[in-house]
Amino acid sequence: MSVVESSLPGVLRERASFQPNDKALTFIDYERSWDGVEETLTWSQLYRRTLNLAAQLREHGSTGDRALILAPQSLDYVVSFIASLQAGIVAVPLSIPQGGAHDERTVSVFADTAPAIVLTASSVVDNVVEYVQPQPGQNAPAVIEVDRLDLDARPSSGSRSAAHGHPDILYLQYTSGSTRTPAGVMVSNKNLFANFEQIMTSYYGVYGKVAPPGSTVVSWLPFYHDMGFVLGLILPILAGIPAVLTSPIGFLQRPARWIQMLASNTLAFTAAPNFAFDLASRKTKDEDMEGLDLGGVHGILNGSERVQPVTLKRFIDRFAPFNLDPKAIRPSYGMAEATVYVATRKAGQPPKIVQFDPQKLPDGQAERTESDGGTPLVSYGIVDTQLVRIVDPDTGIERPAGTIGEIWVHGDNVAIGYWQKPEATERTFSATIVNPSEGTPAGPWLRTGDSGFLSEGELFIMGRIKDLLIVYGRNHSPDDIEATIQTISPGRCAAIAVSEHGAEKLVAIIELKKKDESDDEAAERLGFVKREVTSAISKSHGLSVADLVLVSPGSIPITTSGKIRRAQCVELYRQDEFTRLDA
């Protein structure tokens, strides 16, 4: 079935009509059992549950109202999202607030969206209701425990009709930036279908932009994050690919599960952030893979954070004995503001690593080098599904090839803006290029906030502009420094710049596991790590480390999507709140 721009519930209705008894979604719950408890919905079952829940939602909300989804990863989460769209209500996928702790992010989103409905589950409702306060002049939102409803009953004829008039906004995707003022990206139907078309072109173009029979989506990524949401919830429906899903907890408990799922599902397509590739490489044992073969994997997308060359090599080497084809690994670039996807290399090519002169990168020049000691960067390919330009963020003038600037994006996939933040929307989504080159529109352009460059037509990414370390007047990418550290210590680490006496100094924070060893052995091991890291950073980046902080795993603050909160690291360091292993 070809998908033209219609609606997500409309496509689901078609699938329920033409392939009612085919498997749609399978969720494996590893929290109920270590071996996993499976629940499967066919297309007709998924559609029936969607219709029944949508009918309930219409009793509590009107077109354009917001429904917050604060529920565990489950099939009910998927049903909650599609039912919101079916009812003409703007869906807001979120993570569950942490029990026993005040969750500023959840409070901020409630205040920002003034929801009419909160969709949750009986297992977490006590946590959720703490945040359900009516906004001034409004009623408190209706709290619906989806798992307590009978959604398998025959839908009434009235429930089959779509909402009268759909809002321009389908859903709000809250970014994982500031906890106090999270920004809700407004995604429209046009954005979603444009990005779906781009995704199918880039990842299934060799099959005529259609998933071949036998294809499967495999995902453990959280539904509240843009990559997990599109991969695990949107793509299966629009592309008609059955999905096998689990939760982030299922993966983190035992990373080998992800690789086993890839091997046991045909033509598997999956995605994960860079750290997950490291974790799977280190935590998957040969006995976990006994009798399994990865030769049939269609694609493993590495995205959400900058892809590290050392991670790719480690992952490919680890699973080569199990027939993993390096060409299946797809480093990819995207963000919620572009719906999710922006760039990847063409299918049929293994990841490409290019060395650049480390002395020139801090001065904004990207020059390829063949010599040892270059800075390795991953290519994201030639972008051809949307427009990408490298621009001077201060002047709005395009930068020539081989010159570092801000990555700007233009296409129908670029979202409407930030919910109720007109100034931030104007600043981020309405940028204009001064004296644009031929074939380049003046605007509007999305300012990604990412620094990068084009070399021989290919896109390379340096990192977040706001995270750049400016030491002695030169720009250094924290991602590059962290990649150097991880060649010595593969755990999580953070490179930050801290102001002292009017100058920026480099501080590295490294998570290390404690071992069963004597105090003398521990001191020797920690001293070795410090010496090796200090030497490697000096050699690779020409920088001296002012302070190297060794901490226990879990000490470095991260976002809900696993990215390092560097600004929070700086504050923790200033307040001397890191507990040092070598204190």
UniProtKB/Swiss-Prot annotation:
It is a multi-pass membrane protein. It comes from Mycobacterium tuberculosis (strain CDC 1551 / Oshkosh). This is Putative fatty-acid--CoA ligase fadD25. CDD domains: FAAL. It comes from the Bacteria. Keywords: Cell membrane, Fatty acid metabolism, Ligase, Lipid metabolism, Membrane, Transmembrane, Transmembrane helix. One of its GO terms (cellular component) is plasma membrane. The gene is fadD25. Its EC number is 6.2.1.-. Belongs to the ATP-dependent AMP-binding enzyme family. Gene3D superfamilies: 3.30.300.30, N-terminal domain of ligase-like. The chain crosses the membrane at residues 77-97, 109-129, 229-249. The lineage of its organism: Bacteria, Bacillati, Actinomycetota, Actinomycetes, Mycobacteriales. The keyword Lipid metabolism applies. GO terms for molecular function: adenylyltransferase activity; ligase activity. Residues 353-375 are annotated as: Disordered. It is found in: Cell membrane. GO terms for biological process: Actinobacterium-type cell wall biogenesis; fatty acid biosynthetic process.
